């Protein structure tokens, strides 16, 4: 069988794919992405409601009031949990539970005395924040 120019043109990409080494199963290829760390300026006493422990997640969309209003209207966001820093907080169950899952910020009281919470201390659990 003779190779025609059409078959030769089709065979070249196939050979290129077959010659590419595959990543072994179980080994993930590490791809570095140039992402600048985001800074969130929080006043912990005002960003997290007092009286409870809270897990907080940063919401970039909330910086746009039109989008935030639309999300609240659609019932996607709870307006009571959104503050001016663009952070939405949800309460943790008592007693002091510090597992925030995939949230960005953990908030806990500086003085963990039940009934006497002077301010909340929010710390980042996301290295990009």
Curated annotation (Swiss-Prot):
Location of this chain's protein in the cell: Secreted; Secreted, Cell wall
UniProt keyword annotation of Signal present: yes
UniProt keyword annotations, A-Z: Cell wall, Disulfide bond, Secreted, Signal
Signal peptide range in chain numbering: 1-19
Cross-referenced InterPro entries: Hydrophobin (IPR001338)
Entry-linked CDD domains: hydrophobin_I
One Gene Ontology cellular component: extracellular region
GO molecular function: structural constituent of cell wall
Major site of localization recorded for this protein: secreted
Disulfide bonds: 48-106, 55-100, 56-89, 107-122
Subunit structure: Self-assembles to form functional amyloid fibrils called rodlets. Self-assembly into fibrillar rodlets occurs spontaneously at hydrophobic:hydrophilic interfaces and the rodlets further associate laterally to form amphipathic monolayers.
Family: Belongs to the fungal hydrophobin family.
Role of this protein: Aerial growth, conidiation, and dispersal of filamentous fungi in the environment rely upon a capability of their secreting small amphipathic proteins called hydrophobins (HPBs) with low sequence identity. Class I can self-assemble into an outermost layer of rodlet bundles on aerial cell surfaces, conferring cellular hydrophobicity that supports fungal growth, development and dispersal; whereas Class II form highly ordered films at water-air interfaces through intermolecular interactions but contribute nothing to the rodlet structure.
Entry protein name: Class I hydrophobin 11
Species in which this protein is naturally found: Pleurotus ostreatus (strain PC15) (Oyster mushroom)
Source lineage: Eukaryota, Fungi, Dikarya, Basidiomycota, Agaricomycotina
Gene encoding the protein: Hydph11
């Amino acid at each position: 069988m003779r190779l025609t120019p059409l078959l030769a043109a089709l065979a070249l990409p196939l050979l290129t794919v077959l010659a590419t080494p595959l990543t072994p199963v179980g080994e993930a290829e590490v791809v570095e992405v140039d992402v600048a760390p985001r800074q969130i300026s929080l006043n912990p006493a005002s960003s997290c409601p007092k009286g409870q422990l809270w897990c907080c997640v940063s919401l970039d969309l909330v910086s746009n009031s039109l989008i935030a209003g639309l999300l609240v209207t659609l019932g996607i966001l709870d307006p009571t949990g959104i503050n001016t820093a663009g952070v939405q907080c949800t309460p943790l169950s008592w007693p002091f539970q510090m597992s925030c899952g995939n949230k960005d910020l953990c908030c806990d009281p500086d003085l963990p005395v039940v009934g006497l919470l002077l301010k909340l201390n929010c710390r980042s659990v996301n290295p990009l924040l």
